[in-house]
Amino acid sequence: MAPIPKTVGRIKLDCSLRPSCPLEVAAAPKLCKEFGPEDYGEEDIVDFLRRLVESDPQGLHRIHVDGSSGRLQLWHHDYLLGHLDDEGKSTGQSDRGKGAEGLGTYCGLRKSFLYPPQESEPCPQSPSASATFPSVSDSLLQVAMPQKLLVTEEEANRLAEELVAEEERMKQKAEKKRLKKKRQKERKRQERLEQYCGEPKASTTSDGDESPPSSPGNPVQGQCGEEEDSLDLSSTFVSLALRKVGDWPLSARREKGLNQEPQGRGLALQKMGQEEESPPREERPQQSPKVQASPGLLAAALQQSQELAKLGTSFAQNGFYHEAVVLFTQALKLNPQDHRLFGNRSFCHERLGQPAWALADAQVALTLRPGWPRGLFRLGKALMGLQRFREAAAVFQETLRGGSQPDAARELRSCLLHLTLQGQRGGICAPPLSPGALQPLPHAELAPSGLPSLRCPRSTALRSPGLSPLLHYPSCHRSHPNQPLSQTQSRRPHPLKPQDPSKGWDILGLGLQHLSQAR
């Protein structure tokens, strides 16, 4: 059913404002007129609004709905004159079929919202006008733009100092972390070294002649103790040395040292062979040069040498001569200048039935310390094992000149008995030892002191004193005499000059005198 229009034609707008009014007078929207149900009656509100819009061809008026009363309000806008005329027309034409709610809008927004008024004075006729059309403040147009900061010279200096201080703090912090990590590594390395050097020590040596001699007879041990006391283990030098000891294998360190001294050792061996003819007391061979090493490395090597010496002495006292030879050989690689190590290894070789090796070690011990009583005794025992009784008797006589030696007197008596038997047989010496004599003998018995001793069929293999603590290094030459040996092991026995057979009875006479004195 089509609505019945109440009126036809344009609606007469009784607006008090005219287009000719000055802008400053009508800059703000003014309420012109209100429309209610009594104005459009039964007419369709859409048709009424269309006629209302057509009555304002210049687009100076806007229609709003009062939220409180629900009446239509006609507002007058002079600032849209000439600026939004065309836009108002196009908007009115496009919104004709959309009802009153879509009239005069752009994308759902009123033109009054898109283009706010230029003055902030609200309309005096309606209190809702100020809320519907908010005023534009000058502060909205004054946008704060970013500006370049102007820094003074004092401020720049202060900022520079702060940056430098912060950088220094970061450097100090990094340095502290580095030092802390370094200390932790040093502490761990020191613990590993102490754990390595603090291996289970050998059982305490039994009392007897085989115990190490006292301090006057142990100059090497005294020197080691003094050197260890003089070292400051907390110093940086010692810590660096210990680090090198922990990183380098022992064999590599020793081989490096041995490569630096082969020439000196060869000269010492030649001079020792040339001076064999003179009495042992007059021998003064040139000792081989020492390996240049730092105090820290020397202290660690000496400590390991002492540990291996104790182990070797313990094995020798219990009759394990093969194992003792291995330990003494390892100890000699760490401390090749200790004459006691060669004497103890000579003792083990003599007990194993290897007189040639025993003679070589005894000669080296006397080279390192000429006139050493235990070295002379070991030399005599090795000569007895080689059936060279006349030379052995001369060595035992030299030993007795240094003081009372019951063992030397007993061995001298045995040598004289062998020489007497040879003289009765027409001066024919006993045949040399067979190759089997160099092998260890299986028979063993306990000596009076409780130490096992080997029974030798050709000589009285009595227990000989003089075992000393030795040091450590891996190599074994006891079971492979034909293989190339290290420089400390490659010394072959130098044949002593045989004496005139006519002097044999002189030796017997001197031997009897020494035997009577020893008793």
Curated annotation (Swiss-Prot):
Q: Which residues form a coiled coil?
A: 147-197
Identify the domain of life.
Eukaryota
List-wise, which residues carry Phosphoserine? 278
Q: Which Pfam families match?
A: TPR_16 (PF13432)
Gene3D superfamilies assigned to the protein according to its UniProt record, in alphabetical order: Tetratricopeptide repeat domain (1.25.40.10)
Classification via InterPro entries: TPR-like_helical_dom_sf (IPR011990), TPR_rpt (IPR019734)
Specify residue ranges for compositional bias: Polar residues. Answer: 481-490
From start to end residue, where is composition biased (Basic residues)? 175-187
Per-repeat ranges for TPR:
305-338, 339-372, 373-406
What are the protein's UniProt keywords? Answer: Coiled coil, Phosphoprotein, Repeat, TPR repeat
| Start and end residues of each stretch annotated as Disordered | 175-230, 253-294, 474-506
Tell me the PANTHER family matching this sequence: TETRATRICOPEPTIDE REPEAT PROTEIN 31
Name of the protein this chain belongs to:
Tetratricopeptide repeat protein 31
Gene transcribed to yield this protein: TTC31
